[in-house]
């Protein structure tokens, strides 16, 4: 809302704002507030698809802003200190309170049941309820239940998210009790709020019912899994209770739904009435505006009549004047002549205006009107304005004499003005007035940009500036239109410029005629128009940017707009000082009269405010940040001004001039309005003007009088100065005075800032001391802060403005004079501030690094975070207050979290919000900080950041918007980007910032959501810590006491609450993680495509928040750990990790942060990621994960081996329910202890590594906040990211048992990631390993752990070395490199993100790792290290020729080291396959990675890539190397995993063909990883490492360039037109075709190359060839090199894959094996998709999916079947055959089946199925899936290889390549995920492939025979499945198909986003498809599918065999699987 929820504000306001406002006053308890926020975020995550993404954003914003703003809500937040108060606050009606109590009790029960922290599920129901009531005061979980209840009462829709937050079971229980109660409450609330509608919406209730039923199914499945796994009865009981509760909830929901349906008729009418009222109000407003316009028009007409009269008089005077040439000053004759001349001038002016008007449309008319009005007004003003109508002629004559007397002065002034205007137009600040005007204008322009959103007045400001006479309303409308339509605005500006030119001519002419009136009129008009036109032209973008930057500043912008209007008036006075002083006085009087003094007040205030704003912008950036809380309102305007100014600082002179002109124009507009009002009706004019003034008055009622005086004084002084000065000297003096005044104001502001800082410090101290007071302060400060995050930012400016306003009032002339000095001062201050910020950030980074180096200097890292986020000043204060605030922050940043759970509950809402922001800021400021697992520090930091960071965060967000603080830059290079953005404000940056600000709006929304989620997470962490402390107190022992105490209902209650906390934490952190991913994606997209408004929603704030949010959840866990440690958990480091729940959560938070962030992210993307996010969001999925954890308890048992993982994982599992179950009961203590002990060790190692990683990832962190988060967990970036990715993939994509499995795996992998933390260098591989770990760790945790330790230690050494160098280089040189490549990287990242929306964390991790590898040397080192490790591990794991393959791939990579671009391509393939394999493990993430890889390799195909092919290439290298690392690591991991599970997997690998299978195994570590590790080794050895002859490439490129250069030389003098560039592109393409051998992918390649060339050459359009010829040639050569290298690489891969095919065919029966392999690959994908315990589904999936997939796969993969054996070969085959075939099928089948909307639709179903199918037996399905996955892997890998080759070698446009890569992902990269990929990922074939997985998922239960029959209907069925898959695929295909991540990818990124992309972008068009694509007919495909189904049966047999043979028998697996893969 205030914080950029503007676009979302509508929905939010409708549903949430009223709820919030009413609930704040009446219904919203603090707990409820927070709960509502949480629930809203969660609900939005769940229902992101359902507009709840927006609503949740709004809710988050509302929670943050309205909740914070009302202060009541915050105070209520305090009341929860006595939690019963909050629960029973008067807000709630007695029945509602009773229901809330019941609901809370039930929630507590459900939490206890689900999380089984309290062992007694019944006890939880009874004792837990009682105790909860008792402990609710101190237990945030009670608070959360309260929140849930409150949310439910507020919004029924909030309930599902809350349930998710609490845990699927808890949520269900909460829903059961809370739905009935809350729905009733909602009804009541709706009655109370008048907004029952959002809470009462039947659709929401229905969705809840569906969710509850999903929960029931998932809970039942979890229970079944637990029963299968012999889970503890407590967990089963809890699940049973949960199911009962869910059923009760279902009943209650049904009842409530019935009630609602009964009430709906009433509600709907009420809603309709409300809507009608709104419409009526809007219509009234419109009518009023129209009336105002009419009145203005009437006034204009009256003025025109007066003008005509005056013109007639003037015409006479003009004639005399002309005759006299202004020589005669006497009498009426001169006056008459002047009047006549004036009439002529006016007529000409009007004619010119009218001529120019038509194009401008409304604005032009208004401009014309305003011009005429300006003349009329100026004329009428020159006569006494009040007496103008009756005495106009007399006054005109008298004034004409005066004017004639001053005519010479005017002529001089006009000449000066013209020269100055020309100079100003030339960006010269020669005219101080214009510079002043420009300053004010720029601020107003920003304000106008915001104003259209905020008020019509801001528009009126802008419009009034260009169209002074237009009524404010009309101007507002016109300005809104203008702002909305910059093109129109540009036209209008052009017209205005034309008019200004005409006016100038007229002015010159009338200067000759010496008509002072005309001069004054023209001058005024020119001033207004020129200023406005310049302002508009230059600030049209900035205005929307301002909106983006300061979306929260809407209200502030109204103020600013009013300021700008007033300033414009005052400036116009200044500008019109050219006119006589009498005129000035008259004008001021007229303005005062017309505005009833408000305009003058506004002007005065605005002027001062504007000057102050400028000053404040310079000085108050930080002050505003610090004062933001206290000074939310004016600060926003200041921040907006600052944003505009900041943007303008590079062009400060211009901007100053433009601001001055705008201000002058606005002043003139005000004056004209005043005059018009006076002429027609003072009242009417006052009505209009006072409307604007009243807005100002509303904002600054107290300052109006003073401001009026100051405005009058200033205006008069300025006019006097201008009149007296008449020269630039006067203006210089004016500027000097203004600068002096501004300096004084700056001093004042600095003093104020110091005072505010002191106050803030005191407040912080008070907050630490008194959380309650902190809450009140938060309610006072945070409420406005959250309400107006920008406003808060600007609030300090308000105070400063007040002080400076008084000064400026006293020093009006000085202020006017001060303008130049002020601007220079402001610039200096801005630069100083930016430098300070840079230094601050550097300090923070250094602090964070130092703290990280301290490792587990947990306190230090939060401090570093706060340093980074807060800034240098805040650094010190926050550090001091952090320790003090730690309790407060975790206590809700208001209360000591450890002290009172009730307090936590009380403060939770506000504290969470604050903590959210704090954490976000923490994370933002020190995303590295989050690396340290120091909850106490994080808590302190959070509390500290709660306010300051909030402010700074918000300020940073606006600042990022204002100063182009790119969220991506922030996330990736927070220090550097922040510095860079702050200090460097180039025009390009400004435009980029404007674009960014759109992103920033989105990002800010995401950041808000992240903050919200983070605050929730922090609150939950506080609750968790409090509960942990309580548990500690109760148990007095870390775990030994727990088992005995667990029986105690209190302990159960506490543990239940802890479980709830953890569940909610996991969900919230998943949300945070997803939101961070979203933010990272948005930021990358923003960086890549700053044009994308969505991506930039809150680019700056989002960029940091994504990292902070990601880090926040991790910080939360870290902090909770510290809190646990603080309460004495530090004493029990084992207990701290175990109870750590926070470290576990950090790791889990990786997952859950992802999930948590997903809901927010879903909300934030609103539409984009909502589907994908929904999957991630699926909080039930975490619960599912818990059940899957139960399924993976064996893995958990293995966890003790990986106890570090286990320590974190146990909590994750505890949250998820698997470890949770043991934790809850004796197992809880045991596993926690084990986890704790190992967690301790791992934490120590991890902390040590984290230090390293923090240092290493600091660099990457700055660029990639996500890495920081993983460091927090373990390797916050890697571990958490990988785990988050895995959790996202598993929870979202494998919402079914896979989700569970993946959660446990992810937990393990997080732990492993902790191990791998040191190996962050191979973080890209590590994500794969993490994912592999997620699946394979659970299955092979020990081996994976061992291997990961091995590899990661080695990699860690390499990475540490590299990163140690990279830390310095990345922070410095790498940052600069990254900065240089930022846009390219961002575009590439955006492409990757867009393709991998479902698994942004993997992308983040990958990019982070790539960033860490900031040099090609480091990248290659990492690649080689990974390759060596992988090949060594593969050789160890597999003593076969596979090692040679691995080595060969290493050698190939090494050989590629020479060929950086080609290596990039080759490595991109490998990395793509690595990623794809990773994705196969996490099919979604892998698919996204494959997409990423394809995007990376084909980066130039996408516009972002095309933008910078070189940078893209470099990034490709990075990503390729990262992928190679991931692939190698995954291979190693797969091999290690294969040691444990290799038997099955390797068998599958044997079938699945080595390299692809290896990748698949890595990806599907549990199943395929082993196979791939075994087979891939031989296959890798078999893979002829694709090598690119760089010399040959260079020769080829030179041959091409030889032809191109002469052509370019011929046109060297020409401008690069599209035709010329097209001809160049065609020439290059033709030459390339001549030089390239024709191959099947040549067509693809050429199409891609053409696309890339077109994109890359497009940036040269409009430039002269001679200026950009060199760059153009370099660009062409780079593109050619990259694409040709890629093409050749793909050719090599294709040839290799063909050879591999042949080898595989030898190994496997030729045709049948191929088809069976395709089917098996499908099965493997599907089965692997279902390995999470979907064996049954897997079999069905195998049948169905394979039927579909076999059709698809056999069709798509016929050619590349052999490719399966070798990754390269597979790739080649995939490209050559599989890819084309895959594309064809995916095109034919996918288009029909294309998940155009599948991503979102599938998300819902998938989410549901994630819950439902999540419980499916993970290992069994994994085994079964392993077979299917192997075959599918082979197929998919083959497809991917071929596809990739086809796409890459053919340089298929990124779209196609993405499609092909999706296919690759589906086929080669994700054998295990092949089905899932085919289900979801195949973008080209993804649609149909996705549908087969859907078919598989839906049909998974069906046996293979079904698949065969389905194979025949596969194409149609795939289409059916596509649609079905969109919904069920996520659930059915997702769970059976493979680790539901594929589903997530499918519907989220791959199918929903990526699949849609593939449909829209990635779909390889028929003409693009290689000829091979059509090779197979449906019959052939069906035959192949049948064969594959047979093969699938073989895979089933293999699966049976796999357990034994998986370890080392890759050949055995190879033959069937490899044949399948290769043959496919």
Curated annotation (Swiss-Prot):
One of its GO terms (biological process) is interkinetic nuclear migration. Changing residue 372 to D: Phosphomimetic mutant. The modification N6-acetyllysine is found at residue 399. Disulfide bonds: none annotated. Residues 634-643, 1905-1916 have a biased composition (Low complexity). Residues 116-132, 147-163, 369-383, 425-445, 456-477, 708-719, 925-946, 1152-1173, 1232-1246, 1783-1797, 1818-1827, 1924-1933 have a biased composition (Polar residues). The keyword Electron transport does not apply. This is Pericentriolar material 1 protein. It comes from Homo sapiens (Human). The lineage of its organism: Eukaryota, Metazoa, Chordata, Craniata, Vertebrata.
């Amino acid at each position: 809302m205030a914080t950029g929820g503007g676009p979302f504000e509508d929905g939010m306001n409708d549903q949430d704002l009223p709820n919030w406002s009413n609930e704040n006053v009446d219904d919203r308890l603090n707990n409820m507030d927070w709960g509502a926020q949480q629930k809203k975020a969660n609900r939005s995550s769940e229902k992101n698809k359902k507009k709840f993404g927006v609503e949740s954003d709004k809710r988050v914003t509302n929670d943050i802003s309205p909740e914070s703003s009302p202060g009541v809500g915050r105070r209520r937040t305090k009341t929860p200190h006595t939690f019963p108060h909050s629960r029973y606050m008067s807000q709630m009606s007695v029945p509602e309170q009773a229901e809330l109590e019941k609901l809370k009790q039930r929630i507590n029960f459900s939490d206890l049941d689900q999380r089984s922290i309290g062992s007694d599920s019944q006890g939880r129901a009874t004792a837990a309820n009682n105790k909860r009531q008792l402990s609710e005061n101190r237990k945030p979980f009670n608070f959360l239940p309260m929140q849930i209840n409150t949310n439910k009462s507020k919004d029924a829709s909030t309930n599902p998210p809350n349930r998710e937050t609490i845990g699927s079971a808890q949520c269900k229980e909460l829903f059961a009790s809370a739905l009935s109660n809350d729905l009733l409450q909602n009804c009541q609330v709706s009655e109370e709020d008048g907004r029952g509608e959002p809470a009462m919406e039947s659709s929401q209730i229905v969705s809840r019912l569906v969710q509850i039923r999903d929960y029931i199914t998932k809970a039942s499945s979890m229970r079944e899994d637990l029963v299968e796994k012999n889970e503890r009865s407590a967990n089963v009981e809890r699940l049973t209770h949960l199911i009962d509760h869910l059923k009760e909830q279902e009943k209650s929901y049904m009842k409530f739904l019935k009630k609602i349906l009964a009430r709906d008729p009433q509600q709907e009418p009420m809603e309709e009435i409300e809507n009608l009222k709104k419409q009526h109000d809007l219509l009234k407003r419109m009518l009023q505006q129209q009336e105002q316009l009419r009145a203005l028009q009437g006034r204009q007409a009256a003025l025109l009549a007066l003008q005509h009269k005056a013109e007639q008089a003037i015409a006479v005077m003009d004639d005399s004047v002309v005759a006299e040439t202004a020589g005669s000053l006497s009498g009426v004759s001169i006056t008459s002549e002047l009047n006549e001349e004036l009439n002529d001038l006016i007529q000409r002016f009007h004619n010119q205006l009218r001529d120019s008007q038509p194009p401008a449309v409304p604005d032009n008319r208004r401009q014309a009107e305003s011009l005429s009005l300006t003349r009329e007004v100026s004329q009428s003003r020159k006569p006494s304005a009040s007496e103008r109508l009756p005495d106009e002629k007399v006054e005109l004559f008298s004034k004409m004499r005066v004017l004639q007397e001053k005519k010479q002065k005017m002529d001089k002034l006009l000449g000066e003005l013209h020269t100055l205007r020309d100079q100003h137009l030339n960006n010269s600040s020669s005219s101080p007035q214009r510079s002043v005007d420009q300053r004010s204008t720029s601020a107003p322009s920003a304000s106008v940009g915001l104003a259209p959103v905020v008020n019509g007045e801001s528009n009126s400001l802008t419009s009034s500036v260009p169209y002074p006479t237009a009524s404010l309303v009309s101007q507002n409308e016109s300005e809104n239109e203008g702002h909305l339509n910059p093109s129109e605005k540009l036209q209008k500006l052009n017209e205005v410029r034309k008019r200004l030119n005409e006016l100038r001519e007229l002015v010159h002419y009338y200067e000759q005629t010496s008509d002072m009136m005309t001069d004054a009129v023209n001058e005024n008009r020119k001033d207004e128009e020129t200023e406005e036109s310049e302002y508009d032209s230059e600030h049209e973008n900035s205005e929307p940017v301002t909106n983006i930057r300061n979306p929260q500043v809407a209200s502030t912008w109204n103020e600013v707009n009013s300021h700008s209007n007033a300033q414009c008036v005052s400036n116009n006075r200044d500008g019109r000082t050219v006119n006589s002083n009498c005129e000035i006085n008259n004008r001021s009087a007229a303005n005062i009269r017309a505005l009833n003094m408000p305009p003058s007040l506004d002007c005065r205030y605005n002027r001062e405010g504007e000057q102050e704003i400028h000053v404040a912008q310079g000085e108050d950036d930080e002050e505003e940040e610090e004062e933001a809380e206290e000074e939310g309102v004016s600060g926003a305007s200041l921040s907006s001004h600052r944003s505009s100014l900041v943007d303008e600082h590079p062009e400060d002179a211009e901007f100053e001039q433009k601001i001055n002109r705008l201000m002058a124009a606005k002043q003139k507009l005000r004056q004209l309005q005043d005059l018009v009002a006076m002429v027609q009706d003072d009242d009417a004019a006052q009505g209009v003007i006072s409307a604007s003034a009243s807005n100002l008055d509303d904002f600054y009622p107290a300052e109006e009088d003073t401001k009026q005086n100051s405005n009058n004084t200033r205006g008069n002084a300025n006019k006097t100065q201008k009149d007296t000065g008449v020269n630039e000297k006067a203006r210089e003096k004016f500027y000097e005075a203004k600068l002096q005044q501004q300096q004084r104001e700056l001093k004042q502001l600095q003093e104020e800032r110091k005072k505010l800082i002191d106050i803030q410090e005191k407040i912080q101290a008070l907050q630490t001391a008194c959380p309650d007071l902190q809450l009140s302060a938060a309610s006072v400060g945070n409420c406005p802060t959250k309400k107006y995050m920008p406003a808060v930012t600007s609030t300090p400016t308000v105070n400063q403005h007040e002080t400076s306003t008084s000064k400026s009032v006293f020093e009006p002339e000085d202020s006017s004079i001060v303008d130049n000095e002020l601007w220079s001062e402001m610039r200096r201050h801005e630069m100083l501030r930016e430098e300070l910020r840079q230094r601050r950030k550097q300090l923070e980074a250094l602090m964070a690094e130092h703290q990280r180096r301290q490792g587990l200097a947990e306190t230090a890292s939060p401090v570093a975070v706060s340093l980074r986020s807060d800034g240098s000043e805040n650094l010190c204060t926050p550090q001091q207050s952090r320790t003090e605030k730690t309790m407060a922050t975790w206590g809700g940043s208001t209360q000591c979290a450890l002290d009172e759970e009730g307090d936590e509950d009380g403060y939770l809402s506000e504290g969470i919000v604050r903590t959210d922001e704090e954490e976000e800021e923490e994370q933002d400021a020190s995303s590295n900080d989050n690396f340290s697992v120091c909850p106490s520090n994080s808590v302190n930091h959070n509390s500290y950041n709660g306010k300051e960071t909030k402010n700074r965060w918000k300020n940073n967000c606006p600042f990022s918007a204002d100063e182009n603080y790119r969220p991506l830059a922030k996330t990736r290079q927070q220090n550097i980007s922040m510095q860079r953005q702050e200090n460097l404000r180039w025009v390009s940056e400004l435009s980029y910032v404007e674009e960014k600000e759109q992103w920033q709006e989105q990002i800010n929304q995401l950041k808000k959501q992240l903050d919200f989620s983070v605050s929730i997470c922090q609150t939950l962490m506080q609750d968790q810590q409090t509960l942990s402390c309580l548990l500690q107190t109760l148990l007095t022992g870390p775990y030994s006491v727990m088992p005995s105490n667990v029986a105690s209902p209190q302990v159960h209650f506490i543990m239940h609450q802890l479980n709830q906390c953890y569940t909610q934490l996991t969900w919230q952190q998943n949300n945070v993680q997803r939101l961070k991913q979203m933010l990272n994606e948005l930021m990358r997209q923003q960086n890549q495509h700053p044009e994308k408004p969505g991506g930039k929603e809150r680019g700056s704030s989002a960029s940091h928040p994504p990292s902070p949010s990601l880090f926040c959840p991790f910080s939360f866990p870290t902090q909770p750990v510290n809190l646990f440690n603080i309460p004495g958990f530090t004493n029990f480091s084992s207990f701290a990790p175990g109870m750590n729940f926070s470290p576990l959560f950090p790791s889990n938070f990786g997952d859950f942060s992802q999930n948590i962030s997903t809901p927010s992210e879903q909300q934030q993307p609103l539409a984009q990621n909502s589907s994908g996010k929904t999957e991630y969001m699926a909080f039930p999925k975490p619960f599912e994960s818990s059940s899957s954890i139960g399924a993976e308890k064996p893995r958990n048992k293995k966890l003790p081996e990986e106890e570090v993982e286990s320590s974190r994982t146990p909590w994750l599992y505890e949250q998820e329910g698997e470890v949770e179950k043991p934790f809850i009961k004796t197992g809880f203590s045991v596993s926690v202890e084990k986890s704790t002990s190992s967690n301790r060790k791992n934490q120590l190692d991890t902390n040590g590594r984290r230090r390293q990683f923090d240092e290493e990832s600091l660099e990457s962190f700055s660029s990639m906040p996500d890495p920081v988060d993983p460091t927090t967990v373990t390797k916050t970036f890697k571990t958490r990211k990988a785990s988050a990715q895995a959790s996202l993939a598993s929870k979202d994509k494998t919402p079914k048992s896979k989700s569970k499995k993946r959660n446990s795996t992810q937990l393990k992998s997080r732990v492993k990631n902790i191990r791998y933390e040191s190996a962050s260098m191979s973080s890209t591989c590590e994500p794969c390993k993490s994912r592999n770990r997620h699946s394979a760790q659970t299955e092979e945790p020990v081996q994976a752990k061992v291997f990961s330790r091995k590899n990661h230690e080695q990699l860690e050494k390499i990475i540490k070395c590299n990163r140690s160098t990279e830390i310095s280089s990345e922070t410095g040189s790498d940052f600069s490199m990254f900065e240089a490549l930022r846009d390219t990287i961002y575009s590439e990242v955006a492409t990757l993100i867009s393709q991998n929306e479902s698994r942004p964390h993997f992308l983040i991790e990958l990019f982070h790792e790539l960033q860490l590898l900031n040099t090609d040397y480091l990248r290659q080192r990492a690649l080689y290290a990974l390759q060596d490790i992988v090949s060594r591990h593969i050789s160890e794991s597999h003593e076969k020729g596979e090692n040679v393959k691995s080595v060969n791939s290493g050698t190939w990579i090494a050989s590629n080291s020479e060929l950086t671009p080609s290596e990039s391509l080759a490595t991109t393939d490998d990395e793509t396959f690595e990623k794809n394999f990773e994705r196969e493990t996490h099919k979604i993430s892998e698919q996204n990675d494959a997409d990423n890889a394809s995007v990376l390799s084909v980066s130039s195909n996408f516009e972002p890539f095309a933008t910078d092919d070189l940078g893209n290439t470099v990034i490709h290298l990075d990503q390729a190397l990262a992928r190679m690392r991931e692939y190698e690591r995954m291979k190693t991991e797969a091999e290690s995993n294969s040691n444990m599970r290799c038997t099955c997997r390797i068998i599958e690998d044997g079938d699945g063909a080595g390299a692809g299978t290896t990748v698949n195994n890595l990806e599907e570590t549990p199943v395929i990883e082993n196979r791939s590790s075994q087979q891939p080794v031989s296959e890798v050895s078999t893979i002829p490492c694709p090598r690119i002859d760089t010399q040959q490439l260079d020769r080829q490129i030179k041959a091409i360039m030889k032809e191109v250069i002469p052509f370019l030389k011929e046109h060297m003098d020409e401008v690069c037109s599209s035709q010329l560039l097209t001809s160049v592109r065609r020439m290059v393409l033709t030459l390339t075709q001549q030089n390239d051998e024709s191959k099947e992918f040549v067509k693809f390649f050429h199409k891609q190359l053409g696309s890339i060339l077109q994109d890359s050459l497009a940036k040269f359009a409009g430039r002269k060839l001679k200026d950009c010829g060199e760059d153009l040639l370099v660009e062409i050569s780079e593109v050619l090199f990259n694409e040709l290298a890629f093409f050749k690489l793909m050719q090599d891969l294709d040839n290799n894959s063909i050879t591999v095919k042949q080898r595989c065919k030898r190994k496997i029966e030729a045709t049948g094996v191929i088809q069976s392999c395709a089917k098996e690959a499908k099965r493997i994908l599907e089965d692997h998709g279902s390995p999470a315990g979907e064996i049954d589904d897997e079999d069905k999936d195998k049948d169905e999916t394979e039927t579909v997939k076999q059709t698809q796969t056999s069709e798509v993969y016929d050619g590349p079947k052999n490719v399966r054996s070798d990754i390269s070969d597979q790739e080649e085959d995939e490209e050559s055959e599989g890819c084309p075939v895959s594309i064809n099928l995916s095109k034919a089948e996918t288009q029909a089946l294309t998940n155009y909307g599948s991503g979102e639709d599938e998300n819902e179903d998938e989410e549901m199925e994630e819950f439902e199918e999540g419980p499916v037996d993970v290992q069994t399905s994994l085994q079964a899936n392993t077979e299917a996955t192997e075959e599918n892997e082979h197929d998919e890998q083959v497809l991917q290889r071929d596809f990739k080759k086809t796409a890459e070698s053919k340089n298929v446009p990124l779209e196609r390549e993405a499609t092909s890569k999706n296919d690759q992902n589906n086929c080669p990269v994700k054998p295990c995920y092949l089905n899932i990929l085919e289900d979801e990922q195949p973008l080209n074939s993804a649609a149909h492939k996705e549908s087969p997985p859907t078919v598989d998922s839906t049909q998974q239960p069906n046996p293979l025979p079904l698949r065969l029959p389905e194979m025949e209907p596969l194409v149609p069925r795939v289409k059916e499945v596509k649609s079905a898959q969109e919904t069920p695929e996520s659930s059915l295909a997702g769970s059976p198909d493979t680790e539901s991540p594929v589903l997530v990818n499918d519907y989220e990124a791959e199918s929903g986003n990526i699949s849609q992309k593939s449909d829209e972008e990635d779909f390889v068009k028929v003409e693009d498809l290689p000829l091979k694509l059509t090779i197979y007919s449906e019959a052939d495909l069906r035959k192949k599918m049948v064969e594959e189904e047979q093969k699938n049966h073989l895979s089933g047999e293999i699966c049976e065999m796999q357990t034994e043979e998986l370890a080392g028998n890759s050949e055995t697996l190879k033959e069937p699987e490899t044949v399948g893969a290769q043959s496919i």
